[in-house]
Amino acid sequence: GIWGTLAKIGIKAVPRVISMLKKKKQ
């Protein structure tokens, strides 16, 4: 359903967000 797709997108987006935050901190 909708929540399943959102969960998949969220899981894929998390690593990108973390990498962006790490780059900003550096």
Swiss-Prot record:
<keyword id="KW-1052">Target cell membrane</keyword>
<keyword id="KW-0295">Fungicide</keyword>
<dbReference type="GO" id="GO:0042742">
    <property type="term" value="P:defense response to bacterium"/>
</dbReference>
<keyword id="KW-0472">Membrane</keyword>
<keyword id="KW-0354">Hemolysis</keyword>
<comment type="function">
    <text>Has a broad spectrum of activity against both Gram-positive and Gram-negative bacteria and S.cerevisiae. Has insecticidal and hemolytic activities. May act by disrupting the integrity of the bacterial cell membrane.</text>
</comment>
<dbReference type="GO" id="GO:0005576">
    <property type="term" value="C:extracellular region"/>
</dbReference>
<dbReference type="GO" id="GO:0016020">
    <property type="term" value="C:membrane"/>
</dbReference>
<dbReference type="GO" id="GO:0090729">
    <property type="term" value="F:toxin activity"/>
</dbReference>
<keyword id="KW-0800">Toxin</keyword>
<keyword id="KW-1053">Target membrane</keyword>
<keyword id="KW-0929">Antimicrobial</keyword>
<dbReference type="GO" id="GO:0050832">
    <property type="term" value="P:defense response to fungus"/>
</dbReference>
<dbReference type="GO" id="GO:0031640">
    <property type="term" value="P:killing of cells of another organism"/>
</dbReference>
<keyword id="KW-0204">Cytolysis</keyword>
<protein>
    <recommendedName>
        <fullName>M-poneritoxin-Ng1c</fullName>
    </recommendedName>
</protein>
<comment type="similarity">
    <text>Belongs to the non-disulfide-bridged peptide (NDBP) superfamily. Medium-length antimicrobial peptide (group 3) family. Ponericin-W subfamily.</text>
</comment>
<keyword id="KW-0964">Secreted</keyword>
<dbReference type="InterPro" id="IPR012523">
    <property type="entry name" value="Antimicrobial_4"/>
</dbReference>
<dbReference type="GO" id="GO:0044218">
    <property type="term" value="C:other organism cell membrane"/>
</dbReference>
<dbReference type="Pfam" id="PF08024">
    <property type="entry name" value="Antimicrobial_4"/>
</dbReference>
<keyword id="KW-0044">Antibiotic</keyword>
